[in-house]
Amino acid sequence: MRKETAINYAKRMHSHHKLTLPVDVEHLAKKYANLRFEEFPIDIDGVAANLKQRGKTPTILVNKDRPKSRQRFTLAHEIGHVVMPWHMGTICDITNENLVDGSQEYLTMEAEANAFATELLMPTIWIQRLLDEHENLATISQIIVKNGGVSPIAATLRLRAMLPAGYLFIVMNSKESITYAGRSDGTYATPPNKGDGPDAIKRLSYASDTYTFTAGTNTYFWFKLPDEIELEGESDGDWRLLLDTIVKEITRNTDEQIKYKQKVNGVLGYANSLIGKGAQTEKSLYSACVQRFANNSALDPITKHKKFKNFLASKIRDLMSKI
Ligand SMILES: [Zn+2]
């Protein structure tokens, strides 16, 4: 609720000052506070001091050793601390999580200042218009970076929060190692882990669209995952027998056979729970299962088995027939 209020403060700031993009945060900050760019001996992005202190003007300090786009975000964040009436005293924005005051109140104020900064630099109506006008998420990301004056990761996280279910992003460094990944709310597929390699990209080959752009030494990938996938298997036969056949061909160890079946049933149980949550078609359920199976490398022997698609199609038809 308070986060919503923080966003409204940023919206009001836009209309009150008739701001244009990229927002001149330096000019704006000077209307509310003393502003200094400084070097810090510790790992800190910025400070908002003298907040709501009688007779004192608030002061904003920004770490000048950070990249320009990051300084802009920090500045927008500190303006948030200054204008939100319940943010009081002195707030230090420490980058190193181990040194952060972990109190709930501090974390809430940080989330509010971030929500304020996000809305100030990348207004909701602007992002929504970009999403309406363009299909290519790489194009949209690059427009946000350029016209919003933000970092590619800030633009990516902004899109993540606004996209509907079914989108996943990956950031890969020059050594082809994943440094960041995430998904829009409600997406079935789980993002790969930090440190995973290019195999994670291959596992998303079922995506209906892929958008890529590079920024510095990083490559950004957006995947649009299909709402529905055509059932590929012939689904002749009983899915239980098919699963039995598959696990027996993979291993003769009965304990391992049981473990495989439990893992497969875990994914299918999830699919079953989706049926209870809302309307599903055979094809949408198949897509949900493909998304859940695709990045589970422990199940590779199963999912790469020639009878797996038959098994999955048969199981899904069985699930649907029971509705
Ligand atoms: Zn802060």
Give the residues covered by each predicted segment.
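Active-site hotspot residues in diverse enzymes, especially metal/ion-binding acidic/histidine motifs
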Residues: 1-323
